[in-house]
């Protein structure tokens, strides 16, 4: 496939690297004023979970090719802080054409998203990967390092339920990279649920340690049953906020059972999972985009307040988190 990655962020670069390794043609679109536009190559350190549950540490180089045309088979969009409307404005201004794969945190309903995407065929996904980019000390770097991890699956809407013509090709793209597809009942609901759970994790870690050093905050959280028990209690509150959007949580009980056990018992299971699962632990350590972490918390917080949902522990932790910024 001919693939355009919007930007040069962690998620786009990670999957772009994998797509290129699998033989696809991958280009990146960067604004003229972007400080990343001079980057010609990424040094990649990847904890690869596609063939091993523990992950295999690999090293590689990713040569960056900038966009050279307007028509692509797939346009891969992963943007932080929910700035999808700004990205769509740029896509329209550049007159890019192709199926859009939108894979980022979004706190929107389907009607709003459809209006935003008007004129384009799109499909929603969500990456199961994470990492960080390091540019060194240059103001206009020519090289950078990508430190990332990737799991063996990717969340994707059922291609038969969306109006794209090349759904089979999109599925085959991931298959060519040895990545399995998981297809939730409703991708919008799945993303909202994912953000609600993450908001609980972020606020507990941030209130305890601050998130300016997100790796330290993650370490402390993963090693503490006390903090993990707080996460469980707050997830119960943020799930009520998700339900206030009209999402039927009863349909998701099989995925949420852990949060309905006694909090200390759930915390024990979570701590054991972090201790045993190298990939999960690593993705927690690497997620350091503070603005995006705050965006997740604020989306859930604002929805709860607007809908008058009682979530006292969550609201208090958000205030403590902001006080430590």
Predicted regions and their residues:
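NAD(P)+-binding Rossmann beta1-loop-alpha1 motif at the extreme N-terminus of oxidoreductases
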Residues: 1-53
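Anion (oxyanion) recognition and catalysis
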Residues: 20, 116, 175, 243, ...
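Rossmann-like NAD(P)(H) cofactor-binding subdomain of soluble oxidoreductases
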Residues: 55-142
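Rossmann-fold dinucleotide-binding core
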Residues: 107, 113-196
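Inter-helical turn/loop segments and adjacent helix faces that build the functional surface
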Residues: 178, 182-183, 217-221, 303-311
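NAD(P)-dependent Rossmann-like dehydrogenase/reductase catalytic/cofactor-binding core
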Residues: 232, 236-325
């Amino acid at each position: 496939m001919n693939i355009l990655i919007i930007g040069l962020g962690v998620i786009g670069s990670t999957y772009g690297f994998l797509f290129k390794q699998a033989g696809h043609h991958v280009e990146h679109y960067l604004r003229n004023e972007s400080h990343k536009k001079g980057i010609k190559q990424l040094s990649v350190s990847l904890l690869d979970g596609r063939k091993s549950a523990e992950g295999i540490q690999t090293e590689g180089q990713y040569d960056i090719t900038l966009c050279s045309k307007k028509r692509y088979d797939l346009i891969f969009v992963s943007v932080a802080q929910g700035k999808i409307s700004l990205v769509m404005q740029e896509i329209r201004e550049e007159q890019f054409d192709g199926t859009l794969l939108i894979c980022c945190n979004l706190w929107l309903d389907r009607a709003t998203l459809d209006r935003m995407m008007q004129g384009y065929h799109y499909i929603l996904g969500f990456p199961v990967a994470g990492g960080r980019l390091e540019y060194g000390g240059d103001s206009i770097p020519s090289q950078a390092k990508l430190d990332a991890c990737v799991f063996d699956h990717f969340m994707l809407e059922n291609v038969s339920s969306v109006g794209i013509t090349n759904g089979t090709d999109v599925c085959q793209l991931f298959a060519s990279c040895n990545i399995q597809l998981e297809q939730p009942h409703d991708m919008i609901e799945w993303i909202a649920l994912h953000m609600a759970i993450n908001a609980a994790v972020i606020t507990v870690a941030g209130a305890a340690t601050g998130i300016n050093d997100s790796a330290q905050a993650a370490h402390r959280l993963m090693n503490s049953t006390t903090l993990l028990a707080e996460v469980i209690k707050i997830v119960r509150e943020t799930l009520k906020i998700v339900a206030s959007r009209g999402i039927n949580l009863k349909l998701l009980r099989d995925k949420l059972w852990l949060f309905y056990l006694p909090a200390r018992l759930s915390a024990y299971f979570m701590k054991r999972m972090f201790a045993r699962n190298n990939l999960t632990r690593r993705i927690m350590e690497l997620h350091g985009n503070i603005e995006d972490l705050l965006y997740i918390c604020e989306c859930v917080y604002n929805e709860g307040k607007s809908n008058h949902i009682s979530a006292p522990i969550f609201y208090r932790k958000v205030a403590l988190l902001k006080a430590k910024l």
